[in-house]
Regions:
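N-terminal, charge-rich interaction modules
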Residues: 3-64
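Short, flexible helical or helix-coil boundary motifs
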Residues: 11, 33-37, 86, 165, ...
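Compositionally biased amphipathic helical and low-complexity segments enriched in hydrophobic
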Residues: 12, 18, 22, 31, ...
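General structural signal for secondary-structure boundaries
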Residues: 22, 68-71, 159
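Exposed alpha-helical structural elements
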Residues: 25, 74, 115, 160-163, ...
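Ordered hydrophobic segments in well-structured contexts
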Residues: 46-65, 102-108, 133-148
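Catalytic cores of nucleic-acid endonucleases
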Residues: 66-128, 132-136
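Charged, structured surface patches that assemble and position nucleic-acid processing machinery
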Residues: 120-178
């Protein structure tokens, strides 16, 4: 049945949040959980911080009215380049640290279009198996949209996936510091 699982197209899941958050509210909640002096606004519609809440994570929040993958990739590239230059973050980690290293991309939008839903529905299992796992979330209205996990996900990827969803849900539900 492994071929069947790999060929199925899974849909992102919507997790309801207790309230609708604006871009600034999300920035504040990330800032409350951030490592001191790591919060940056590199563009008008992006916010970066590092946090050690549940993961040693890099967070990039991007506001997009109408998702276009090329625009999102350009923002990611520009911000990641600036972050690497400013913070001199290592590209290699000790084996014991890898399970906790993550990059989180959070897209904030008023309405999720088809291109956005296709984008977050691709490759979650592959991105979570990287040394520094990568996960993309979407915040749309009062919902957290999470990518589907299907295919050849190993136990470590499933743990990262479940832990990342719990972490995001907690960060967005509670405005206090973690």
């Amino acid at each position: 049945h492994a071929w069947w699982v790999r060929t199925q197209k899974a849909l992102p899941a919507r997790i309801p949040l207790p309230e609708t958050l604006c871009f600034e509210d999300i920035c504040e909640r990330l800032r409350a959980a951030a490592v001191e002096d790591t919060c940056r606004t590199y563009t008008e519609n992006s916010f970066f911080c590092r946090s050690t809440y549940r993961f040693d994570g890099r967070f990039l929040l991007v506001r997009m009215e109408n998702f276009q993958k090329a625009d999102f990739d350009a923002v990611k590239k520009r911000v990641n380049h600036a972050v690497n230059r400013e913070f001199h973050l290592p590209q290699r980690y000790a084996a014991g640290e890898l399970a906790y290293k993550m990059r989180f991309y959070i897209l904030y939008t008023e309405a999720a279009n088809d291109e956005l839903m296709r984008h977050i529905s691709r490759n979650a299992e592959t991105l979570l198996r990287r040394a520094e796992g990568v996960m993309t979330f979407v915040l749309c209205g009062d919902s957290l949209i999470v990518p589907p996990l299907y295919g050849d996900a190993d136990t470590a990827a499933v743990r990262r996936y479940a832990g990342a969803i719990r972490m995001m849900r907690d960060l967005l539900r509670h405005p206090r510091a973690h």
